[in-house]
A protein has these predicted regions:
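C-terminal motif of bacterial Sec signal peptides marking the signal peptidase cleavage site
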Residues: 19-23
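Alpha-helical transmembrane segments
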Residues: 14-18
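Domain-level detector for secreted/extracellular nuclease and nuclease-toxin modules, and
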Residues: 24-313
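Bacterial N-terminal signal peptides that target proteins for export
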Residues: 2-11
């Protein structure tokens, strides 16, 4: 993007955010990068005269229900254009220290739950392009994970509503090192559970999803494009279901091992239940504050425990 266009987008964003908080979802919808400040504010590092620019309050994307409390990473939002309107595809907080996402957040709702696009062709190279919003702070396209696979967080199958939406899930900022065994069996069971629930209008009006892996509790460190990158010891998911005025939440905590095997369909839900926990418990394990934009009383209630029956488990 040219300097002129970035500056124009920056001025537009300022105007919209000052005009009305309800309009701010239309700000910066092609996913430009912002640095999260310790006080929860952001600045656009590409804006002209950035040293003189006052931080912009994160009143927009950080206010969405799926967005966890931000830390000191790089906040990125990727959007697509659907039916002449912008649509948030997913968001993430990137850790430049680890060259991996701290988390990736997205939602299933009436606008994106349709399945109309196929998976990106394996013939397209790079298969996993560099995130265009990270520049030198991110990993290069198709950077090898040295024996580990590129494990999606926002899965390819999570975003089948358009070609652009699916393609964006292949950015290097949306993948973490996963063993082929884990990526092809155990993780798929949890991904499929989320996709089935997210695409069911009878189950949820909106299903909010956050996924990640542990960056400090690791199996090992590997060298990727000259950088030290951790291989998470655990992967996790945080889910929030909204149906009418009813809220329920659920967490998953799954060890990243190499010895998983395929299991019969009748054993999948019991296995998922064994790895389920409350959001409060997941927050303790990850150090991440999930769903902080819920009303306080709702947040306390839905995060304290989970109902297996509410999730069909």
């Amino acid at each position: 993007m040219s300097t002129y266009n970035k500056f124009a987008k920056y001025l537009t964003m300022m105007a919209v955010m000052l005009a009305a908080a309800t309009a701010c979802e239309d700000v910066d919808d092609d996913g430009d990068i912002f640095s999260v400040q310790p006080d929860g504010q952001i600045i656009d590092p590409d804006a002209p005269g950035v040293d003189e620019v006052s931080p912009i309050p994160l009143t927009c994307y950080s206010a969405r229900l799926e967005t966890p409390a931000l830390k000191d990473g790089i906040f990125i939002e990727h959007s697509t254009f659907e039916r002449d309107d912008s649509l948030v595809n997913y968001m993430l907080e990137y850790s430049p220290e680890h060259f991996l996402p701290r988390w990736v957040a997205f939602r299933f709702d009436a606008r994106n739950r349709a399945v109309t696009a196929n998976r990106k062709s394996y013939d397209i190279k790079p298969q996993f392009p560099a995130d265009p919003d990270l520049g030198s702070k991110g990993l290069p396209g198709d950077a090898s994970f040295n024996g580990f696979q590129h494990g999606h967080l926002c899965a390819s199958n999570d975003r089948r509503n358009s070609r652009e939406a699916n393609d964006q899930t292949f950015y290097m900022s949306n993948v973490m090192p996963q063993s082929g065994n884990f990526n092809g069996t155990q993780w798929v069971y949890f991904e499929s559970f989320v996709q089935t629930k997210g695409r069911s209008e009878s189950f949820a009006d909106t299903l909010y999803v956050v996924k990640g892996g542990t960056l400090d509790d690791v199996r090992q460190n590997i060298s990727v494009a000259g950088h030290t990158v951790p291989v998470p010891r655990y992967f996790w998911m945080a889910l929030l279901r909204v149906k009418g005025t009813n809220y329920s939440a659920l967490g998953f905590w799954v060890e990243h091992r190499d010895n998983y095997t395929e299991i019969p369909a009748t054993e999948i839900n019991p296995m998922i239940l064994e790895h389920s926990l409350s959001i409060d418990q997941l927050e303790t394990l990850t150090g991440i504050n999930f769903f902080p934009n819920l009303p306080d009383d709702v947040e306390r209630t839905v995060e304290a425990s989970f109902s297996a029956a509410a999730w069909g488990l």
